[in-house]
Amino acid sequence: MRCPFCRHDDTQVVDSRVSEDGAAIRRRRRCPACDKRFTTYERVELALPSVVKKDGSRTEFDRRKIVASMQLALRKRPVAADAIDAAASRIEYQLLGSGEREVRSERLGELVMNELRALDTIAYVRFASVYRRFEDVSEFEDVIEEFRRTNAPPAAPAKPTRKR
């Protein structure tokens, strides 16, 4: 690696260790030409897909927007900030795992809804009402009914009957 001070082409690694969060390798380097030391960090470069909006325009994926929209839906709900962060990470991992270069904003909204559904029912309905642009109460009822249908507990097994 090139020295940032004297521009010498070859530096020596003096110390390497994993960063506290485990997401990077911290390296202390020394330049043999000027004898100065500096620190570098080695991280994995993740290429998240760009987002294709409804109007066809494209923008970079922004995790902060995902977190902000989830926080808004979860406002005054008993959900920890760590749970929101973990949900945003799961969305990122799903996008990375897809291998696609672009994701439609509609798909991103569905991923957020799925995460909110698992975190908090009220937040899920709140987000759905804005995301799907509800115009009347029947649309709320439809979402709630769908939620009840898909999240209904399994039916209790029938009790055996005795023969007399």
Curated annotation (Swiss-Prot):
<comment type="similarity">
    <text>Belongs to the NrdR family.</text>
</comment>
<dbReference type="GO" id="GO:0003677">
    <property type="term" value="F:DNA binding"/>
</dbReference>
<keyword id="KW-0804">Transcription</keyword>
<protein>
    <recommendedName>
        <fullName>Transcriptional repressor NrdR</fullName>
    </recommendedName>
</protein>
<dbReference type="GO" id="GO:0045892">
    <property type="term" value="P:negative regulation of DNA-templated transcription"/>
</dbReference>
<keyword id="KW-0863">Zinc-finger</keyword>
<keyword id="KW-0479">Metal-binding</keyword>
<dbReference type="GO" id="GO:0005524">
    <property type="term" value="F:ATP binding"/>
</dbReference>
<keyword id="KW-0547">Nucleotide-binding</keyword>
<dbReference type="Pfam" id="PF22811">
    <property type="entry name" value="Zn_ribbon_NrdR"/>
</dbReference>
<dbReference type="InterPro" id="IPR005144">
    <property type="entry name" value="ATP-cone_dom"/>
</dbReference>
<comment type="function">
    <text>Negatively regulates transcription of bacterial ribonucleotide reductase nrd genes and operons by binding to NrdR-boxes.</text>
</comment>
<keyword id="KW-0238">DNA-binding</keyword>
<feature type="zinc finger region">
    <location>
        <begin position="3"/>
        <end position="34"/>
    </location>
</feature>
<keyword id="KW-0678">Repressor</keyword>
<keyword id="KW-0805">Transcription regulation</keyword>
<dbReference type="InterPro" id="IPR003796">
    <property type="entry name" value="RNR_NrdR-like"/>
</dbReference>
<feature type="domain" description="ATP-cone">
    <location>
        <begin position="49"/>
        <end position="139"/>
    </location>
</feature>
<keyword id="KW-0862">Zinc</keyword>
<dbReference type="Pfam" id="PF03477">
    <property type="entry name" value="ATP-cone"/>
</dbReference>
<dbReference type="GO" id="GO:0008270">
    <property type="term" value="F:zinc ion binding"/>
</dbReference>
<dbReference type="InterPro" id="IPR055173">
    <property type="entry name" value="NrdR-like_N"/>
</dbReference>
<keyword id="KW-0067">ATP-binding</keyword>
